[in-house]
Structure formats: structure tokens, C-alpha cells
């Protein structure tokens, strides 16, 4: 081994391969930096729209399409927001998949409804979603599509004595109905189904299928990984049901 080191160092072919590898690595780093710089205007505009107090713009050079998001442990890291839609019947299969590079779920329920109908040929009668999806505009749109929304009503920000389930003067009919509905025991019972479906899928994806950290880069490839998980999950569900 001791004699092999100087021989390898003097071998022109080995040196050429190493130089080529270093050059490729440098070129790839430059391309990632260029891609990150191209993302800055979009990230800046998103920060302005969200009213963020911190104007600092951060773009990942490892994956320029990822965005810095708050994690469950309280830290901030580049990430993607994976969205799944799951049925609440006995099958409990995934019928919708999407990936976005925003930490907020705002505005995602409407396109997911369209995707579910496109994939299954059926529009759901009810939609059980987390509070982040419950924007008034989304509730109005769901009502137009004759879909009943079940989502937590946020507590009043200023007047903590006000009943959040009582409609406000500027509420639309759909939003007012949603507030009243979520104050009933029946709605609360229905909403509990979400924990046994959506949260189960999310836990399986992160804890058992490795979707807590992707081995690919870019929205398109991450969506491919999420879709592959959904396919695998559905096959395993059908097997467990004797299908």
C-alpha cells in the first residue's frame, strides 16, 4: 500500500479523472447557486404578501425549490409541504397528492377537491381539514361545489369572550353555516374521523416510509416520491382489507 500511493499520484489517467470530478462538482455548485438566485424574487414576493416582519430572504443552495419552513421541533429548515387527501370510509385510501413549497396550507383545499374529482370521478360530500385550510374563500368555494366543510373555528384574536361559533356580521352564508355547524356535537364527532385517517397517513409517511426527509431534489421529483408512497400505501391498505 505504501508504494501504491506515489504511483497513483503519478498516473496521468487517475489525475485526469480526479480533475474531471472536481470540475463537475464545481460546475454543479455553480448551477445550484444560479438556481437559488433565480428563486429570490419569488421568495421576496411571498414574504411581502405574507406580511412577514423579518425581511431576510433565505434560499437553499442544496435545493433551490425548497423553502425554509418551521419544523415540529421548533427549528427552521429547507423543506417541502406534502399534501394528502384520504377517504374516511373503511378503505381509508389516499385519493389526492400534492407538493408545494410554502409552509402555509392556505388555498390548498380547492385544488385538492378538483384533483379528487379528477382522479376518482366523484366529488366528496364532506371535507375534513385542519384549521390551516379553513380560509373563508375556500369555504365559500366548497359551498358552491356543494361540499360541506368540517374544520376547527379559530378562537377570536381580540375578544376572547366572544363565542367563535356565532356568525359575524360580514360572514357569508357558507362561513356563517360553518361556524354554527362546528359548534355542534355532531360536527365534532364527524371531525374526529380525521385523526384516524389523515393523521394516520401523515404518521406512516414520516415514521415508516422516510418522507420526513427526501433523498431527491426539486418539486417534481418530491411529488414523484410522494405519489410513490401513496401508491404503496394504497396497495398495502387493499391487501390488509383482503383485496
For each predicted feature, which ranges?
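Anion-binding and metal-coordination hotspots
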Residues: 1-243
Amino acid at each position: 500500500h505504501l508504494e501504491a500511493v506515489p504511483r497513483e499520484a503519478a498516473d496521468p489517467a487517475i489525475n485526469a479523472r480526479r480533475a474531471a470530478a472536481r470540475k463537475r462538482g464545481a460546475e454543479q455548485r455553480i448551477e445550484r447557486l444560479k438556481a437559488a438566485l433565480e428563486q429570490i424574487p419569488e421568495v421576496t414576493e411571498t414574504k411581502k404578501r405574507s406580511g412577514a416582519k423579518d425581511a431576510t430572504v433565505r434560499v437553499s443552495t442544496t435545493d433551490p425549490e425548497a423553502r425554509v419552513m418551521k419544523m415540529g421541533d421548533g427549528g427552521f429548515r429547507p423543506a417541502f409541504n406534502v399534501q394528502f387527501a384520504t377517504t374516511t370510509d373503511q378503505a381509508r385510501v389516499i385519493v389526492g397528492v400534492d407538493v408545494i413549497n410554502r409552509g402555509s396550507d392556505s388555498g390548498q383545499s380547492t385544488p385538492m377537491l378538483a384533483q379528487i374529482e379528477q382522479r376518482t370521478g366523484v366529488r366528496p360530500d364532506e371535507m375534513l381539514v385542519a384549521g390551516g385550510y379553513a380560509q373563508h374563500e375556500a369555504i365559500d368555494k366548497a359551498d358552491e361545489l356543494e361540499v360541506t366543510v368540517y374544520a376547527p373555528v379559530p378562537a377570536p384574536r381580540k375578544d376572547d369572550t366572544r363565542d367563535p361559533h356565532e356568525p359575524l356580521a360580514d360572514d357569508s352564508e357558507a362561513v356563517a353555516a360553518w361556524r354554527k355547524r362546528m359548534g355542534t356535537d355532531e360536527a365534532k364527532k364527524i371531525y374526529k374521523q380525521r385523526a384516524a385517517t389523515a393523521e394516520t397517513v401523515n404518521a406512516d409517511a414520516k415514521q415508516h416510509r422516510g418522507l420526513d426527509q427526501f433523498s431527491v431534489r426539486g418539486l417534481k421529483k418530491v411529488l414523484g416520491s410522494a405519489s410513490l408512497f401513496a401508491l404503496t400505501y394504497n396497495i398495502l391498505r387493499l391487501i390488509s382489507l383482503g383485496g
